[in-house]
Swiss-Prot record:
InterPro entries: dGTPase-like, HD/PDEase_dom, HD_domain. GO terms for biological process: dGTP catabolic process. Residues 65-206 form the HD domain. This is Putative HD domain-containing protein L394. It comes from Acanthamoeba polyphaga mimivirus (APMV). Transmembrane segments: none annotated. It comes from the Viruses. One of its GO terms (molecular function) is dGTPase activity. PANTHER family: DEOXYNUCLEOSIDE TRIPHOSPHATE TRIPHOSPHOHYDROLASE, DEOXYNUCLEOSIDE TRIPHOSPHATE TRIPHOSPHOHYDROLASE SAMHD1. Disulfide bonds: none annotated.
Length: 457
């Protein structure tokens, strides 16, 4: 693997360790990065599966947040060192560091790489499931993993890198992890690109997820990484020929959501986990750990199930004080957990695309069936899945900049007609699902679905 060695006079940037990677070969990290990797907060990511509950449907989906984070570190290194090599005298506006535009130096580059390394360190158990499913009813700024990543990164940097980084550097790292709308320009488009979603985080997880699950993907980020420029407006721009590579990237994301991330069985498992969480959170206060990063960093994918198992089957040397009603709630949670292990899962009885009535039609069906069978309502689950090019509902295509290799001084956007695939369908696909929790009424529910749709004809 070729490594760009920039002649920086900074001892802390000496390469210190080599990691094997099934995507990029070998990855070298600096001594500053190694100090972060060797913390308990970062090592916790070994016990955090990248794809949450997907491993219960796809046995190979066991790769972790740790390997993804190191992969993003390497892709960040490749991009930022290429920027330095191509534009050694260019100045950038970095408000956390200076009121005036400044040139890149060794420490700034190291900060950007650290941001890539730590961008996911704030994930909770089962990754996105923790925020998007388990904490949906919680109103707190720390419910978002990007915010927690910033908080944990600050804790680590102040503890482990106090001799290398000051408060301004730490604030800069946090702004790269979670940029706001005021953070403009190429520097803030590397790790987490709010402009159009083209960033090294996406490059790595698409490559890593498809590789580990053996799902073919036509997207390869190499051309985008090796051919971009920074235009006169300080945005990253790509050769106009790369519009097809970018289209493949967006389509790969959509396909991974369709095939894996939003697979119907994955989603019903998430609903079962939510029911478990609803039962035990009032007892164990798991959601309250987002107020205390020291406590939060003790959580892993195993935490929720271990709390249940330890309470139901306590070891002789562990004393647990649980009220009778609390114990009954934990027993109910354990029943759901055992059903997951024995594949006695919730079942989907119907799904309706938003364009065909979506939520309104699903709610109408629930009203229809509960009028006929009042006791069935608590056994039905209404759930929405969203699949698309990027997170959110904004169209990214008008924010992607291209250049002509014969005239690279000026960048431009391309009309949407230049992009193929899902662009003709819009940037998001919303589907509403109804799940049945009780296997005893499954046949009845499916029978009533047929009756309901017959009444609409």
């Amino acid at each position: 693997m070729n490594v760009i060695h920039i002649n920086f006079k900074m001892k802390s940037r000496e390469y210190s360790k080599l990691f094997g990677c099934n995507i990029y070969g070998f990855i070298r990290v600096t001594s500053m990065a190694q100090k972060i990797i060797d913390t308990s907060e970062f090592q916790r990511l070994r016990n955090m599966k990248q794809l949450g509950l997907c491993y219960l449907v796809f046995p190979a989906a066991t790769h972790t947040r740790l390997e993804h984070s190191i992969g993003v570190y390497d892709r960040t290194r490749k991009v930022i060192e290429r920027i330095y090599r191509q534009y050694p005298d260019r100045e950038y506006y970095i408000p956390e560091l200076s009121d005036k535009p400044i040139k890149l130096d060794a420490k700034i580059i190291e900060c950007i790489k650290i941001a890539g390394l730590c961008h996911d360190i704030g994930h909770g158990p089962f990754s996105h499931v923790f925020d998007d499913v388990l904490l949906t009813d919680i109103d707190h700024p720390n419910k978002h993993h990007e915010i927690r990543s910033c908080l944990i990164t600050e804790i680590i940097c102040k503890r482990e890198l106090s001799n290398e980084l000051n408060d301004k550097h730490i604030d800069f790292i946090k702004s790269i992890i979670n940029p706001t709308s005021s953070h403009k320009g190429a520097i803030y488009q590397i790790v987490s690109n709010n402009l159009n979603g083209i960033d090294v985080d996406k490059f790595d997880y698409l490559a890593r997820d498809s590789k580990n699950l053996n799902i073919g993907s036509e997207f390869n980020a190499s051309r985008l990484i090796n051919e971009f420029i920074i235009d006169k407006n300080n945005n990253i721009a790509y050769p106009k020929q790369c519009c097809f590579d970018i289209d493949e990237m967006y389509n790969s994301r959509y396909c991974m959501h369709k095939k894996v991330y939003s697979h119907k069985t994955v989603k019903l498992l998430e609903m079962m986990l939510k029911d478990i969480f609803t039962l035990i959170d009032p007892i164990f206060k798991i959601s309250e750990t987002i107020n205390d990063m020291d406590q939060f960093c003790k959580l892993t994918d195993n935490s929720i199930f271990e709390l249940i198992s330890t309470t139901i089957n306590p070891r002789p040397f562990i004393k647990i004080n649980i009220e009778p009603d609390q114990f009954m709630a934990i027993k109910k949670a354990n029943t759901i957990y055992q059903n997951i292990l024995s594949r006695k899962l919730y079942k989907q009885i119907t799904e309706i695309n938003e364009n065909n009535g979506g939520k309104a039609l699903c709610e109408k069906f629930i009203e229809y069936i509960t009028n006929k069978h009042p006791n069935i309502k608590n056994s039905l689950y209404l759930f929405k899945t969203v699949r698309g090019f990027i997170g959110g509902n904004k169209n990214p295509f008008g924010q992607i900049y291209f250049y002509d290799k014969m005239e690279d001084d000026n960048s431009f956007t391309m009309p949407e007609c230049h992009f193929a695939g899902l662009i003709n369908k819009g940037t998001q696909e919303v589907t509403w699902h109804i799940y049945c929790k009780d296997s005893k009424i499954l046949d009845l529910a499916r029978f009533e679905v047929k009756n309901f749709f017959n009444t609409l004809e």
